[in-house]
Amino acid sequence: IDALLSWGIIQDNVGSIGCRLVFPDGSVQHAGQTVQIDEFNMLQCTHRGYKCRRKYKNEKVAGNTAALMMTRRDTFISNGGFDESYTECWEDIHLNMKYLLAGYSNWYLDDITAIHYESYTRTKSSEATYRLRYDYTYKLKPWFDQLSASDKQTVLSYN
């Protein structure tokens, strides 16, 4: 926590700061977020993790997971904080996109690692899956779709 905090203090114009999150077995769960438009013109928001083939480094990213993310309080508040109407997920991606559109940079720090127990704590019920899909379909995607072409390009340029 101190390393994330001290790094954020010395940087200007930071939206969020995140780090490498690994599962208890050591496999990478999170190494920054990506936001893409797929071949079906659908918004795809993913965590760079075990499927990511690029070399990890400290770099600007589309966003960071709120499982372990730092942001300045004034930046958080002035950008509306988390949208609490999300029921299962996606509010961190939404906030990170708002930071990019406001001119902030989101940073992933690869030299800092934490263990993330998401797979042990997130329910796998059909109800949770429904809430996840609902939040994406009726909250995040419509918000993204209404952005201007240049704002969409700003968000998509970090992949």
Question: Where are the model-predicted features located?
Answer:
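A recurrent flexible, glycine/aromatic-enriched loop bordering the glycosyltransferase active site
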Residues: 28, 36-74
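Conserved donor NDP-sugar-binding/catalytic core segment of glycosyltransferases
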Residues: 1-38
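Active-site rim elements
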Residues: 58-60, 82-86, 120-128
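Active-site-adjacent helix/loop segment of glycosyltransferases
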Residues: 7, 22-25, 93, 97-159
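Donor nucleotide-sugar recognition loop
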Residues: 61-115
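Active-site lining segments that contact anionic ligands and/or coordinate catalytic metals
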Residues: 14, 66, 121
